[in-house]
Regions:
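PLP-dependent class I/II
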Residues: 1-194
């Protein structure tokens, strides 16, 4: 099973679906949707590509477990597939600009931040600040009114990291990172890290 919801939002090398590899098409269930690449969040539209025998079994479950998607949503999805490539390309370029901005900004703050190659999130490290991810997120929200997701929301290995979305305007990201930089500077002073 290959969840390819972010397949259109990759940076650098183009996405390669596992189903395109020799011998994999007949053994792959590919899952995708419209929420990420076509910005159709909340429409709850998705699709699966798989060998016919598997799709027939999936249909048996689907038709009794889930009601049909509204017709207007289905028409919108068809329109997105037919004519949305230009919009996806523009959105990807915009995300890429914001991605580069955030990575650069966190590194400028002295925080390690790996460059993501897909989706629209960065995962900077705050380990050197001597706070847990939850403490950092709560204190940042309290002091600077900036919300981030603690890395621990994604498991214990996320401790010491934050997840930050760049699905916002560059102007909003600049405003938020100015506040975040001020907060990081204050924490360093309070903890004697400067």
């Amino acid at each position: 099973m290959s969840d390819e919801i972010y397949s259109e939002l990759t940076y650098g090398a183009e996405h390669v679906t596992i189903a395109s590899l020799p011998g994999m098409r007949e053994r792959t269930i590919l899952i995708n949707g419209f929420s990420k690449a076509y910005a159709m969040t909340g429409w709850r539209l998705g699709y699966a590509c798989a060998p016919k025998i598997i799709l027939e079994q999936m249909l048996k479950i689907h038709q009794f477990a889930i009601m049909c998607a509204p017709t207007t949503s289905q028409y919108a999805a068809v329109e997105a597939l037919k004519n949305g490539d230009k919009d996806v390309k523009q959105m990807k370029e915009s995300y890429n600009q914001r991605r580069r901005f955030l990575v650069h900004t966190f590194r400028k703050m002295g925080l390690k931040c790996f460059e993501p190659f897909g989706a629209f999130y960065v995962f900077p490290s705050i380990k050197e600040l001597g706070m847990t991810s939850d403490e950092f997120a709560m204190e940042l929200l309290k002091r600077e009114k900036v919300a981030v997701v603690p890395g621990t929301a994604f498991g214990s290995c996320g401790e010491g990291f934050l997840r930050i979305s760049y699905a916002y305007s560059l102007e909003e990201l600049k405003h938020a990172t100015d506040r975040l930089a001020r907060f990081v500077e204050e924490i360093r002073k309070e903890k004697g890290l400067i």
